[in-house]
């Protein structure tokens, strides 16, 4: 069973790790597109409704995505047809439930939208841990940046964040 709960040091999880792109779309998506091309990345996983919608809208189709259909801007992802399947899970704020972890395990294989009832934010860590080599995990930072994580470059360091999670 794989379940984690954020119990302490929330400040560490709000930090804009490691590549913060402080540009609005479509420029932010173009920067990631260039990073993918220049770095030889094969997989892109998006976490969050706004980021996923922007990637889809500007033609950078994620390998898989996680959304919760709740944004400050009222934006919804409606192009689920870009993916083979939709997996619905329950994942409360501050958690990575066993059900959500299993869905991310399927999602890293490609073509999956993980549709979360609750909150999808913490699933970025599951994607970072489970993504295959040559992957990027992208999500939105609460202050407006697009965060892009080349997993091969930063996985070891970012997995230290699991030390601040409690098993549940």
Swiss-Prot record:
It holds the Pfam family DUF359. It catalyses: 3'-dephospho-CoA + GTP = GDP + CoA + H(+). The keyword Metal-binding does not apply. Keywords: Coenzyme A biosynthesis, GTP-binding, Kinase, Nucleotide-binding, Transferase. Coiled coil: none annotated. Pathway: Cofactor biosynthesis; coenzyme A biosynthesis. GO terms for molecular function: GTP binding; kinase activity. GTP binds at residues 49-51, 68, 70, 120. It is an enzyme of class 2 (transferase). One of its GO terms (biological process) is coenzyme A biosynthetic process. InterPro entries: GTP-dep_dephospho-CoA_kin. Its EC number is 2.7.1.237. Belongs to the GTP-dependent DPCK family. Catalyzes the GTP-dependent phosphorylation of the 3'-hydroxyl group of dephosphocoenzyme A to form coenzyme A (CoA). HAMAP family: Dephospho_CoA_kinase_GTP_dep (MF_00590). This is GTP-dependent dephospho-CoA kinase. The lineage of its organism: Archaea, Thermoproteota, Thermoprotei, Thermoproteales, Thermoproteaceae.
